[in-house]
């Protein structure tokens, strides 16, 4: 096995992580700005994924993974939101959550439902890390707890 073969899985995983982060950002943008899915996907693919924008270099991301998450969340939102709502504490409504947290939970829930080929632990860990990139307080713990509850309900398994 060559060195190049050893590096390929890590690169793919890293590109999926970058795609997840970009998907959360795109979903946030859609939520706040009312941007449509086709417009936001085209913008990210042309100007953000692996590109430099306003002095920031965006990580190279798996574009098909990005598209799958963004379009899947939009397509399945009426199924995702009730699941997320049922996993929140009784006195919390999804609408009370920060838009970024909503985007993270929707993307994570979509992957738990749709990407059975990806272990729950990977999905939950990736989205908790994304939450840490945006928040220093309790939001990452909330993301962990909610996605873990959803995984138990949907797949019968939790993050190990």
From Swiss-Prot:
It holds the Pfam family NusB. Keywords: RNA-binding, Transcription, Transcription antitermination, Transcription regulation. Signal peptide: none annotated. GO terms for biological process: DNA-templated transcription termination; transcription antitermination. GO terms for cellular component: cytosol. It comes from the Bacteria. InterPro entries: NusB-like_sf, NusB_fam, NusB_RsmB_TIM44. GO terms for molecular function: RNA binding. Involved in transcription antitermination. Required for transcription of ribosomal RNA (rRNA) genes. Binds specifically to the boxA antiterminator sequence of the ribosomal RNA (rrn) operons. Belongs to the NusB family. HAMAP family: NusB. This is Transcription antitermination protein NusB. It comes from Rhizobium rhizogenes (strain K84 / ATCC BAA-868) (Agrobacterium radiobacter). The gene is nusB.
């Amino acid at each position: 096995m060559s060195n190049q073969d050893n590096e390929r899985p890590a690169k793919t995983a890293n590109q999926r992580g970058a795609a997840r982060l970009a998907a959360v950002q795109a979903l946030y943008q859609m939520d706040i700005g009312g941007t449509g899915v086709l417009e936001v996907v085209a913008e990210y693919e042309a100007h953000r994924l692996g590109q430099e924008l306003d002095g920031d270099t965006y990580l190279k991301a798996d574009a098909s993974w990005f598209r799958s998450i963004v379009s899947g969340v939009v397509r399945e939102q009426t199924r995702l939101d009730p699941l997320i709502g049922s996993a929140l504490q009784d006195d919390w409504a999804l609408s009370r959550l920060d838009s970024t947290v909503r985007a993270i939970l929707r993307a994570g829930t979509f992957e738990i439902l749709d990407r059975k080929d990806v272990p729950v632990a990977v999905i939950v860990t990736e989205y908790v890390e994304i939450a840490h990139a945006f928040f220093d307080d309790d939001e990452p713990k909330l993301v962990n707890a909610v996605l873990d509850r959803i995984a138990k309900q949907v797949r019968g398994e939790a993050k190990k």
